[in-house]
């Protein structure tokens, strides 16, 4: 009860608006999360960014964003937004929409296989991962994708996958992406917005200037061609400080009106191309949701 009272007191004193970030979450949990934040008002991402740009108040306003374009997540939660008249932004990584699984999905597949089949990690000829615990292995793989380039990431992950499971057989159970026809149909509604999450979902800090430009420009063009609407926001893959560098922020400023991270915080005196978001997950109770928002 005391924590609840403190949370409510802090929430009432907060001045800046905020951007929520979701990944894979059930529609029931998503709806409960948003309703727990009312009467604060969900508004379009573009609008909250514009208010922030002009120095206008964003108090008691927030924007809803979903990363990665997982089909079930997008379709089911879009229905929730439609029912409640909530504006929502979906960040799409283009290669995933075109059929290529995301690196973190491969790691989760490795983790699942390890937990189901092995008491310890099976023998590997990779000297970097000999005599390593399963927990440590998964932590190291996640650490790697936050800072490494696409070729290294895929090389390592495919190496492990081939050793411990039949990838061609099991990948059918991996999360499917939304398809372009579905993107086009949803985009017809004014409540929806599809924005860029790059091409390959690779940390931009691991890329050359040419690669960063390609990720940003090509993804922007692909979505605009599909929806016929302007793509004005970029979401940095992984979103952590170590996954973003000064060069990527500078390049984003040339092609977009804003760019978002997964660094927790509210919209205060933030760089428009390094905007914080508040991440919410399936396991978060509504009390924790309000606490996260209160302390951000």
Regions found by a protein language model. Give the residues of each.
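C-terminal active-site subregion of NodB/CE4 polysaccharide deacetylases
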Residues: 1-65, 71-72, 188-189, 199-202, ...
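Metal-dependent polysaccharide deacetylase catalytic core of the NodB/CE4 family, i.e.
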Residues: 20-23, 59-62, 82-242, 269-275
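Aromatic-lined substrate-binding rim segments of carbohydrate-active enzymes
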Residues: 72, 80-82
């Amino acid at each position: 009860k005391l924590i609840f009272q403190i949370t409510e007191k802090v929430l009432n004193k907060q001045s800046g608006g905020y951007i929520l970030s979701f990944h894979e979450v059930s529609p029931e949990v998503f709806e409960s999360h948003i309703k727990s934040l009312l009467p604060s008002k969900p508004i379009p991402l573009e609008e909250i960014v514009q208010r922030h740009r002009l120095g206008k108040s964003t108090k008691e306003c927030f924007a809803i964003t979903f990363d990665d374009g997982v089909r079930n997540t997008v379709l089911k939660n879009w229905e929730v937004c439609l029912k409640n008249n909530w504006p929502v932004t979906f960040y799409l990584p283009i290669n995933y929409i075109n059929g290529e699984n995301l690196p973190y999905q491969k790691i989760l597949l490795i983790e699942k296989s390890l937990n189901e089949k092995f008491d310890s990690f099976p023998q590997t000829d990779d000297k970097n991962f000999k005599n390593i615990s399963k927990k440590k292995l998964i932590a190291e793989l996640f650490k790697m994708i936050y800072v490494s380039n696409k070729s290294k990431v895929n090389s390592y992950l495919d190496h492990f996958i081939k050793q411990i499971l039949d990838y061609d057989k099991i990948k059918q159970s991996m999360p499917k992406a939304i398809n372009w026809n579905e993107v086009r149909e949803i985009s017809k509604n004014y409540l929806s917005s599809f924005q860029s999450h790059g091409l390959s979902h690779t940390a931009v800090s691991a890329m050359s200037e040419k690669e960063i430009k390609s990720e940003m420009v090509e993804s922007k063009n692909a979505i605009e061609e599909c929806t016929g609407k302007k793509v004005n926001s970029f979401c940095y893959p992984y979103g952590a400080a170590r996954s973003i560098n000064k060069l990527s922020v500078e390049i984003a400023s040339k092609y977009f009106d804003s760019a978002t991270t997964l660094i927790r915080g509210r919209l205060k005196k933030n760089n428009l191309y390094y905007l914080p978001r508040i991440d919410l997950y399936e396991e978060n109770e509504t009390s924790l949701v309000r606490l996260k928002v209160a302390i951000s």
